[in-house]
Each structure stands twice: as structure tokens, then as C-alpha cells.
Amino acid sequence: MKKIKIALVGQPNVGKSLLINALCKANMKVGNFSGVTIEKASAKTFYKNYEFEVIDLPGTYSLDGYSEEEKITRHFLNQNDYDVIVNVLDATNLERNLILSAELLSLNKKMLLALNMCDEAKKEGIELDTSILSQEFQSQVVEISAKTKENLELLLQKIIILFESKFIPRSQFYTPLCEKSPEKEDLLYFINELSKKIITHKKEERNLTKKIDALLIHKFFGLPIFLFLMWLLFQLTFSLGQIPMDYIESGFNTLGEFVKNNISNTFIASALADGIIAGVGAVILFLPNIMILFLGIALLETTGYMSRVAFLLDGILHKFGLHGKSFIPLITGFGCSVPAFMATRTLKNKRDRLLTLFVINFMSCGARLPVYVLFIGAFFPSEKAGNYLFGIYILGAILGLCAAKFLRMTAFRGLDEPFVMEMPKYRMPNWHLVWFMVYNKAKMYLKKAGTFILLASLLIWFASNFPKSEENLNDFNAQERAIEQSYLGQFGKGIEPIFQPLELDWKLSVSLISGLAAKEVMISTMGVLYSLGKDVDETNNDLKGIIAKNIPIPSAVAFILFVMIYNPCFAATIVFSKESGKLKYTLFLFLFTCTSAYIVAFIGLHIAKILLN
């Protein structure tokens, strides 16, 4: 079987990621904002006796650019570690796309032009004379639709023919293809004239996108609409997620009781019920909320709305020292900090990139969501829970803006750069791809629950049960004394004075420390530490009830505020260190976020006390 290595190249928003999904059935992220493919990604497919390895390179407008994505693409193409270049173009916006195509031709490699979104071009009355394009660019042209999978088999056939044919260097149809000004202006003129020959509009261009934009990015209505959509997302995240949560919680409680009642060895029964089931179950409990949140974010991305919000918030972000493009990493941070940190590569200015890296942590990631849902469900009525959840996320964003202003005035001074960003057309989401985006997130969440969090739960259970107490543990007070004398209890009592001003007990203090590894571990830790009271008080036989009974509301407020701001998980911290480039920035992140969290939590504690008195 022969192997063909394909470099998939194109400008942002031309559908490269969608194409690689269609060709290789790869579950890759697809979005409508610049830089969705931050790193080189690959997938494989097989056709006839050939194995195709498709390298999805970051979207780039030019090979002359200096952003991280453009550097990655240029470096890969200059390495010659591929057989064929497949240049993907947007058939509805061909003229702009051809500039990159001309630059790619100057590499003098085997290249094929794939005109994507031809189905949309036909709907808009756009006709393309591909014979002229093929002749002028001395390359094969294939009209395809990654969305409907039209002509994808033909594309593979053309790639095979190109791969098997002997490469004949092209005659230079235009000399200064990759030169800079003033020749670059001549290239633009050439592309413009060529486009007039290739492109024919049979009817007026549809202006549906403009009509929608007139409302969604309106000067007065745009921001309220965005806030309403965010409120609706968090409202649905809590209210819809609550329905399966009750069944999942009941199932794990029943399973734990079954294990305790049917395993005679109390040591093994406790390890399984109080360690694994209580710890892992407490994390899996919030899977529905996680899936609903990621579904909402995926829909906003794939429809093209997120790019509009970046434009809408540019003025506000600039006032706080952030760049308009910072919005993309920031909104990604609501899902997970790891891809959010990586998405800062779209920012060319180093100061803007570093500032955005620091502020991302204030955007509550999906791993923090279970903590919020747990505490909101414990202390507030369910009909208002969505409002409180929305308020927590908005408060985190506001604190992030304040932190950005502070850092811009101190550590990251510099001039603002202008904001230029492409506005893609609105598109109906591809439900198959949206599902796989959500499925992948859920799969990662469950994988973490079944590996890392399972081990953490066992470790926490062991540390909270040893050394063994000689007392009769049928008494609740004896159980409390036993856990306080355990290794975990001794550690918790040791760090308790640090968190005493926040009025957090040693159990919450230990939960915060465990959250440095992964925020989900906090839920697992509380699930183990607070599970002792289950057998004693039957009216509070779930984690929410136990927390509501044992933690005062002001302390709960302080805990939530601390969780909202302090250092990201270990995996995200490693990525932050890599993206920032220096260890000193990682140390500063830890000190800055933990100090900010402590101050905000202290203020929140006393405000809550005043309001409750």
C-alpha cells in the first residue's frame, strides 16, 4: 500500500477542518473564527491501495505573515515533508483566497486546488470557470463541498493521479509571486483581473448575513443580545442538567449502599463505596451540565456568531488593555484553559499575548462548573440557579477585565494595535460535527474521571482513613475524630490557619489544594470527606444536603470566589508555561491568581455576612 502525505493549506474559514473530517471521519474541532486550527493536526484515510495522511495546517492569509499560525504553516511547507499540497479555497470568496494560492505556487510543488463550498456558491448565483483557473495556475481544480461530501471521491482520485505523475516545474506565469511591495500590489491587480474572468454573478448577492448583522452587532442591541444568549446558555446548563443529575446521583448512592451491604470485608467495601464510588460518582454527576455547556459553545462557534461577538466587544476590551482578538481565547476559556492558552497564538504582539494568557484564568473553565453547580444547588432554589450561575461567570469575566487593566498599567505596558478580523458568513451548524465536538469533550471528561480522578479518589480515601482509629466508628463524633487524626486530617489541620481568615474549614482547604491538580478533584475530595455523615443523617443523604448543613453561606461564597480565580489545573499550567515561554511567568501566574483569589474571597466573605445580617 502506497502512502501519500498531503499538506492541507488554506485561509481561515475555508472549511479545511470540515474537509478533513469528511475525508477521514476525524473528530476534529470546526469553527468559524480565525485560528481554529491552532496546531498542526493530522488524520488518515484509505482509498483503493493508498493510505492518505492529511496534515491540517493552521489557517493563514499569507506566507509572508508573522503570527504563530503563519510561522507554523510556512515552516512546514519549507521542510518538504509532504507529497502534495491541497490548497482549499472558499468558492464564495474566491478572489481573496487566490492570493495565498499564488504564493503557494512559488514553492514549485505538486499542488491541487480544491474549491470548497461550491454548493453555497451555486445558491448565491456564483458561477466559476474552473478551466481558466486551472490554465492560469497550471494546477488541477476540483469543485467540492465538504458539508455535503460532493466530489470528495473525485478529489482523492485527482490526488492519486497528481502523486503518481512526474512533476514538471511550472513556468512562472507571474514573476514576483512571493515578493513584497511594490510587486505585491501588482500581484493583487493580477488576481483582481483574473477573478473577473473566472467569477460570474447570475443574481444579486444574498444579503442575509448583513441583515442578521444589523441586529446582532447593533450599537445598542448587540451587547444585550449577547448577554441574553449567555444567560440562556447557563440557565439551560443548570435546569436541563438537573434532570439527569438526580437519577445519576440516586444511582451512585444505591450502588454505594449495595457495595457496603454485600461485601463483608469492611476495608474493601469502604474503599469501593467511600473512595471510588463517592469520588468518581461525584464527578460523573456533573457530566450532563458539561455536555450542555459545550453544546452551546459549539453552536455559537459553528454558526459564525463568535466572530461577531469579538467585533462587538473590541471597544470594551481595548478600554481594559486587551486586544479584540483576545476574545477568542477568552471565550474558549469557558470550555477549557488548555486550548484557550494555545489560541493566544492568534495574537501577534507578545504583550497582548501574555496579557491574554494571564486573564484567561479568570474565565471559569468547564472543570469549575461542577463546583458552582454543587454549591448553587446546595444553597439556592433551583428556579433561580441559572441566574446565580450566570452571575458567577459574568463576575469572573469582570474581574478578569479589571486584572487586565491592572496588568496593562504595570507589567505589560505598550501601545494598542488595530483590530482586523474576518467576518464569516452565517451558516447552519453541521449537527454531526457539533455532536462529535460535544462527544469528544464528554469522552475526555469521563476518561479523566476513570483514570486520574479514580486514583486521586483512592489516594484521598486512603489518606483520610489511615492511620486507623481504635474507637468505635459507629458514632458520628468518633468518625469525625478519626478523620481529623488521619494523614489527610493532619495535613488539613496544618494548612487550616492559612484559610482561617476566609472561614474555610480544613476539609474545604484540602479540597482547594487538591484542585491544583485538577478542578474536578475538588468534587471528588468533598465527595470522600463529606460522605461520612450519610449514614448518620438520613434527611441529608446527598452531597448537596451535607454541604448545606455543614458550611455557612458566607464561607461558601468565599470558597466559590477562590475557586473562580486561583491557579488553573496542572495540565493547563504546563501549557501556560510553554506558551508564555518563561518559568518566571508561570510563577507569577501562581502568585497573582492565588493572591487575587484570597483578596476577592475575603471581601466576598464579609459582604455576604453584611447582606445576611
UniProtKB/Swiss-Prot annotation:
Outcome of substituting residue 132 to V: In strain: F38011
Positions contributing to GTP 3 binding: 56-59
Keywords attached to this entry: ATP-binding, Cell inner membrane, Cell membrane, GTP-binding, Ion transport, Iron, Iron transport, Membrane, Nucleotide-binding, Transmembrane, Transmembrane helix, Transport
Family (UniProt): Belongs to the TRAFAC class TrmE-Era-EngA-EngB-Septin-like GTPase superfamily. FeoB GTPase (TC 9.A.8) family.
Induction of the gene: Detected in iron-restricted, mid-log-phase cells, part of the feoA-feoB operon (strain NCTC 11168).
Residues reported to bind GTP 1: 10-17
One of the record's GO molecular function terms: ferrous iron transmembrane transporter activity
Organism, scientific name: Campylobacter jejuni subsp. jejuni serotype O:2 (strain ATCC 700819 / NCTC 11168)
Record-listed GTP binding positions: 116-119, 145-147
GO CC annotation terms, alphabetical: plasma membrane
Effect of residue 254 to A: In strain: F38011 and M129
Membrane topology: Multi-pass membrane protein
Binding site for GTP 2: 35-39
Annotated S-S bridges: none
Phenotype of gene-disrupted mutants: Loss of 90% of Fe(2+) uptake into the cytoplasm, reduced growth rate in iron-limited medium, strain NCTC 11168; in iron-rich medium Fe(2+) uptake is not affected. Reduced survival in human and pig epithelial cells after 3 days, strain 81-176. Reduced ability to colonize chick cecum, strains 81-176, ATCC 43431 and NCTC 11168. Outcompeted by wild-type bacteria in infection assays in piglets; the 3 different strains colonize different regions of the gut differently.
Superkingdom as given in the UniProt entry: Bacteria
Subcellular location: Cell inner membrane
Gene3D superfamilies: P-loop containing nucleotide triphosphate hydrolases
Name of the protein in its database record: Fe(2+) transporter FeoB
InterPro entries cross-referenced by the UniProt entry: Fe2_transport_prot-B, Fe2_transport_prot_B_C, FeoB_GTPase, G_FEOB_dom, Gate_dom, P-loop_NTPase, Small_GTP-bd
Main localization category: membrane
Membrane-spanning residues: 220-240, 266-288, 290-312, 322-342, 357-377, 387-407, 444-464, 510-530, 556-576, 587-607
